[in-house]
Amino acid sequence: MRIKDAIIKIFYTRKDVSEIYLVIRDRVKGTSEIPFSNIERVDNYYIYLNDGETVIPLHRVIEIREKDKTLWKR
């Protein structure tokens, strides 16, 4: 399953995404966790956060986590 499909599936099948996080590669920090509740939308190449300015390329996502459980991993 592609990362875009995994994100969309979670949004449409889960009522509560407050404990789900994207783990991304960050050039400065190494890895970062982004709460799913901060995601506004996703297209074929990018994830757009609801702060109005942050855009994350899909290739930077390495994992989707819920608490200690891995839902998707590259």
Curated annotation (Swiss-Prot):
Similarity-based family: Belongs to the UPF0248 family.
InterPro entries associated with the record: MJ1316 (IPR040459), UPF0248 (IPR007547)
Pfam families assigned to the protein according to its UniProt record, in alphabetical order: MJ1316 (PF04457)
Coiled-coil residue windows: none
Name of the protein in question: UPF0248 protein STK_06965
